[in-house]
Amino acid sequence: MKTPLRYPGGKSRAVKHILPFIPEGVERVCSPFFGGGSVELALASRGVQVFGYDKMKQLVWFWQGVCGDNNRLADEVEKLQEQYVIRSKKTVKGCSKKSFHQYRKDLMTESFMFSYERAAKYYAINRASFSGATFSGGWSERASYAR
C-alpha cells in the first residue's frame, strides 16, 4: 500500500532502498516520527506490526481515521467535496482556495479531539498544498484539482 499523503521529507521514493536494511524476522517497528508513513506501510504490508506516533495532532487524526474506519473517512472527504460543489455551483471536484484556508483555520482553532471530519479536512489540505506542506505551505490550484 502506498501512502495517500504527500509529505515533506517523505520516503515514498526511497522505500525500495530502505527496506533491504530492515532485518528479516522483524515483527514490530516503533516509529516516533510517522509522517507520511511510506516505509511503515510497506512494512505493515509484509505483516510487521507498526506502532506509529507523531507530534502533529492533525496528522495523527488522519491516520486514526485510516486505521479506524477508512470508509467513514472516505465518506467525510466526499462530503467536503460535495459541500464545495453545492456552495460554489461548480462541478469540478477539488479543494478551493477559500475552503483550503477555512479548513486550515478550523484545524488550528477547533477542539483538539479526533473526529472523522477533522481527519478529512487534514487530508484535503494535504492534497491541496504545495508538496503536502499543510500548515506551512500555500494552496496549489494544480495540486488541488489534480488529485
What positions do the PLM features span?
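Class I S-adenosyl-L-methionine-dependent methyltransferase module
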Residues: 46-147
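S-adenosyl-L-methionine
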Residues: 1-34, 38-39, 43-45
